[in-house]
């Protein structure tokens, strides 16, 4: 196993950090699509739509074309959700990481390195709703460096930071399609606190849910 070191973010890390963040966000799109394809409701909609078009036109070509169009629209809708999230973050806290995370005692951003190459990232800042709870966000590890406990070390770094700063808990959110992330957080010791349905247009067909986790820090 490679020697992994965790250190605080520097401005010279920006391009690599941004790449890991965007790639880590985009890679969930196939899982979201597959999750949608497994839902009976989705197949019901497809069958009804194609059957209706065939009954109106008696054309197999138009029916198949409508099937392809529906799949394309569904994929594009999911793409817009993930792309929109990444773009929004790049306009907000990820636009200037130094200013967003490194200028306060209670916020921080870390990178994981192997042989001086940045292979993982994570950030932490207090929750707006509860200033005694720290929010873990933007955890991402390069694909070719997984299964080396890098995610675990980054999570533990945030927990240690929270404990040193006197926070009562570390909170985070993930999605039901992120199986690896869920296993990681639960292995570290995070407990599920809430499951919510996000209010985006296609969610009634995708069964996409947001899972909130909490790690209580013992005093």
From Swiss-Prot:
Q: Which PROSITE patterns match?
A: GNAT
Q: What is the recorded membrane topology of this protein?
A: Multi-pass membrane protein
Top class in the EC scheme: transferase
Q: What is its main location?
A: Golgi
Assigned EC number: 2.3.1.-
- What Gene Ontology terms for biological process does this UniProt record contain? gastrulation with mouth forming second; negative regulation of cell adhesion
Instruction: Give me the segments passing through the membrane.
Output: 42-62, 64-84
Q: Which UniProt keywords apply?
A: Acyltransferase, Developmental protein, Gastrulation, Golgi apparatus, Membrane, Transferase, Transmembrane, Transmembrane helix
Looking up CDD domains in the UniProt record yields: NAT_SF (cd04301)
InterPro entries on file: Acyl_CoA_acyltransferase, GNAT_dom, NAT_camello-type
Q: Where is the N-acetyltransferase domain?
A: 62-218
Where does this polypeptide localize?
Golgi apparatus membrane
Name the Pfam families for this protein: Acetyltransf_1
Any one GO molecular-function label of the UniProt entry? N-acetyltransferase activity
SUPFAM superfamilies, sorted: Acyl-CoA N-acyltransferases (Nat)
Concerning Gene3D superfamilies, the annotation shows: 3.40.630.30
Q: Name the tissues where it is expressed.
A: At the beginning of gastrulation, expressed in deep cells of the presumptive mesoderm. At later gastrulation stages, expressed at the interface between already involuted and preinvoluted mesoderm. At late neurula and tailbud stages, expressed in the deep mass of cells lying ventrally and laterally to the closed blastopore.
Assigned GO CC terms = Golgi apparatus; Golgi membrane
- Domain of life, per lineage: Eukaryota
What does this gene product do? Plays a role in regulation of gastrulation, possibly by controlled reduction of cell adhesion which is necessary for optimal cell motility.
Homology family:
Belongs to the camello family.
The name this protein goes by in its record: Probable N-acetyltransferase camello
Source organism of the structure: Xenopus laevis
Q: What is the lineage of its organism?
A: Eukaryota, Metazoa, Chordata, Craniata, Vertebrata
Which gene does this sequence derive from? Answer: cml
């Amino acid at each position: 196993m490679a020697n992994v070191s965790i250190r605080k973010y520097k401005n010279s890390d920006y391009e690599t950090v941004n790449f890991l963040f965007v790639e880590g966000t985009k890679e969930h799109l196939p899982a979201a699509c597959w999750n949608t394809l497994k839902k009976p409701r989705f197949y019901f909609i497809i069958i009804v739509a194609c059957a209706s078009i065939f009954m109106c036109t008696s054309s197999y070509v138009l029916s198949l074309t409508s099937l392809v169009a529906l799949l394309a629209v569904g994929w594009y809708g999911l793409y817009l959700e993930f792309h929109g999230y990444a773009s929004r973050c790049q306009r907000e806290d990820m636009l200037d990481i130094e200013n967003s995370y490194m200028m306060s005692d209670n916020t921080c951003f870390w990178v994981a390195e192997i042989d001086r190459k940045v292979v993982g990232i994570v950030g932490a800042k207090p929750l707006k709703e509860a200033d005694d709870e720290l929010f873990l966000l933007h955890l991402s590890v390069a694909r070719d460096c997984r299964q080396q406990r890098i995610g675990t070390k980054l999570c533990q770094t945030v927990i240690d930071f929270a404990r040193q700063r006197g926070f009562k808990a570390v909170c985070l959110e993930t999605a039901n399609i992120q199986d690896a992330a869920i296993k990681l957080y639960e292995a570290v010791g995070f407990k599920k606190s809430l499951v919510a349905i996000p209010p985006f247009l296609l969610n009634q067909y995708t069964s996409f849910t947001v899972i909130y986790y909490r790690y209580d820090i013992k005093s």
